């Protein structure tokens, strides 16, 4: 299983270089699961929609769409998806993929991350 995590610092679809990175992860590397933090208002590009499923969750308390979290996963192996809220209000996604639980969370910077992780 190939898993990748990436803080794209904004929607990859709005930047040609970031879009090339995303396409590389999904086509060349053929990652089974790609987790993106700060993905903006992400929509899965049409050329990948037949094979992949995606989930986008807004962070609670965020004042813009930049801090959204996204998981892109191969459709054939996704068993379930759960949404969690950390102690600081940040959202997390848990994906059961082929029997493995995979989590993504965009933690607060600094010491806030300890509370985010501990309270899940």
What do the predicted segments below correspond to?
Residues 1-49:
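N-terminal, active-site-proximal structural segment of metallo-dependent hydrolase catalytic domains
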Residues 8-15, 81-83, 111-113:
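Short, flexible loop segments at the rims of nucleotide/cofactor-binding pockets, characterized by
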Residues 10, 103-120:
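Active-site-proximal segments of metal-dependent phosphoesterases and phosphodiesterases across multiple
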Residues 33-108:
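Structured beta-strand-rich core segments of catalytic domains in phosphoester-bond hydrolases
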């Amino acid at each position: 299983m190939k898993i990748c995590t990436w803080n794209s610092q904004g929607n990859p679809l709005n930047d040609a270089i970031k879009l090339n990175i995303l396409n590389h992860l999904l086509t060349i590397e053929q990652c089974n699961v790609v987790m993106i933090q700060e993905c903006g208002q992400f929509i899965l590009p049409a050329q990948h929609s037949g094979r992949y499923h995606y989930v986008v969750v807004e962070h609670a308390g965020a004042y813009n769409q930049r801090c959204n979290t996204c998981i892109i996963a191969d459709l054939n192996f996704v068993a379930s998806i759960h949404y969690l809220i950390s102690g600081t209000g940040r959202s997390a996604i848990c994906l059961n993929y082929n029997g493995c639980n995979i989590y993504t969370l965009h933690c607060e910077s600094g010491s806030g991350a300890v509370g985010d992780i501990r309270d899940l």
